[in-house]
A protein has these predicted regions:
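Residues within helix-turn-helix
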Residues: 31, 127, 138
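C-terminal flanking helix
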Residues: 17, 21, 41, 109, ...
């Protein structure tokens, strides 16, 4: 598979925006998903002129989204969390989760949370999870496994 010039950014955004938002709603929560979404696509826009489309742009944008989500969690952990402003538009949760499960997912370490969300919410294969996390497939499997174990212990 050769590389080619990627589609215009607007089309790229419309093709992948919903997938990224779905991922971020679970990865960082509804209250922060819009902000992290904007940060993700600003980073992508800056890098986009240098990107070659090898058929894996979906993995590329999810890698940016996962790193932006991890950065978000680091910022939150460093200092007091400001009270989020309600979004101007409603953020649609991909699937309703009960509060206990949502809290348990939010409490997972960032890489485990991202791995579990990609595997069990977005149904992504382990090789893609590894690529998004910048790890090996074995490490991706280990993050999913450890995350699920923690969820079972917390939720019961």
């Amino acid at each position: 598979m050769g590389t080619r010039t990627p589609p215009p950014f607007e089309r790229f955004l419309s093709e992948h925006g919903a997938t990224v938002m779905r991922f971020l709603v679970v990865a960082v929560g509804s209250a922060h998903a819009d902000d992290v979404y904007q940060e993700t696509f600003l980073s992508a826009l800056r890098a986009y002129p240098k990107v070659r489309d090898d058929g894996r742009l979906d993995r590329w944008i999810l890698r940016i989204a996962s790193r932006t989500a991890i950065d978000h969690h680091r910022r939150v952990a460093k200092g007091p969390t400001p009270t989020p402003m309600p979004p101007d538009r409603a953020v649609h949760d991909p699937e309703p989760l009960d509060d206990g499960l949502r809290d348990a997912v939010a409490a997972l370490p960032a890489k485990q949370r991202i791995a579990v969300v990609l595997r069990h919410v977005m149904d992504r294969p382990y090789d893609e999870i590894a690529e998004v996390l910048g790890s090996t497939e074995g490490a991706a499997r280990a993050n999913v496994s450890a995350g699920l174990k923690s969820l079972r212990e917390r939720v019961g």
